[in-house]
Amino acid sequence: HFFKTVSGKPLIRPAWYYDVEQQGEGIADVTTHLIDLINWQCFPDKTIHYQSDVTVNAAKHWATPITLAEFSQSTQVDSFPAYLNRYIKNDVLEVMANGSLNYTVKGICIGIKVTWHYTPPTNGGDTFTSIKKGSKATLKIVQDEKNGFVKELYIQKEPDIDNRTFEAQLQKTVEQLQITYPFLSVKNKKNGTYLIDIPQEKRLGHEEHFSKVAKAFLHYVHNQDMPEWENENTLAKYYITTTAVEMAKKGNK
């Protein structure tokens, strides 16, 4: 969201944040974090070579309309700077903030969609949904109004999988995870759906995640020991996002 509260204070953007020539397109922004999450979850500790393991198949982008009042509220600037004139239509600033892309990694099909609104919903913030389909189950991370905008992990069993066998394997897996995360538990929500329950007090916040990432980055800078898979996966990540931007621009012509 363009205008939101971070650490209890309104987030004020610089005016140039709305210029995609300076800030970059949305399809190459939040998408980088989503690609990291996908790689960590689906290809843990695997090296991804962008030249041989990645194929970007399709990408598109579209604009979020921002009024002058909204722009001024979020930047504390009273008027649109001249460099934004090319994005203004009927007195409304059109920011190419949204995008979707489809690609494959090691033959696995992946789709990402990012949508920017001006403000988050009431009592909500930046929201996230993830769906991973497997042969035995589908993993869903849901964060919506129904759940009070709290991220929850659900496992949906495939209909042709035996209930008793599935539950036994799921419980065994959870018990293995409990060695490291003893607070984890699984709840049967019926109709083949299971909730992996993580107590709120055990969840790290947004700022805490940034702290962990910063410490890891500074460690790599100081010790010059970034793992090879991390190096290659970083190249692959930015290959995907930059290729997606190029594809989306060509599609709009």
Language model: regions and residue ranges:
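Predominantly a Rossmann-like dinucleotide-binding segment in NAD(P)-dependent oxidoreductases
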Residues: 1-90, 217
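Glycine-rich, charged/polar anion/phosphate-binding loops
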Residues: 86-87, 114-118
